[in-house]
Amino acid sequence: MALTAVELVRRSSGIYALPELNSRLNQKLEDPASTNQQIADIIQLDAGLSASLLKIANSAFYGFPSTISSISQAISIIGRIELADLILGKSVIQLFNKSEIDKKSLEKHWKHSLLCGLTARQLTKTIENPEQSADSMFVAGLLHDIGKLLIWMELPDKAQEIFQRFDPKTPNHAYLLEKEILGFEHAETGSELLKSWKLPQVLIETTCFHHHPDET
């Protein structure tokens, strides 16, 4: 029986699971009764995440006149919705950067995904009263090809076959090859992975249909 995208995600769920810290943070972020200090207490358990958050809060993007030195203050500056998106994006990048995919391919993947995320964020800012925040759309762009990483890691021989047969001059050739060789495409794999992480439906759908937007 041929492997499906659902089965591929299920068999690798223990390897590519988001840290427990994410679950705890999301619970607090979604709880209107929680305080910024309670959220900060969880973030401070991860030194790397704490440093990244302070760096972002002190960036020119937020333009705060004085230096932000505490996590709770950084949360106030960034906001809870944006914070959740930033933490998710950083956690996913860290998760796959520990993989055995060669560095050059991984850098190429994240460069493309980052450009998609930045483009999605800018487009969202041009829309009056958008349904989703610009930062949510940034994360959607960042994660849209996440299924490719899982295929590269779990099915390297088939991924190599797809790469060798790929013709960049043929529109949509990569995912058509995936359907032929695997029986499913990276968009299906990615959306199933995001489902297993219990991520927002908008991220699941943008990942699932990014090659078929007319089907959303």
Question: How should these model regions be labeled?
Answer:
Residues M1-F163, D167-T216:
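Conserved alpha-helical "signature site"
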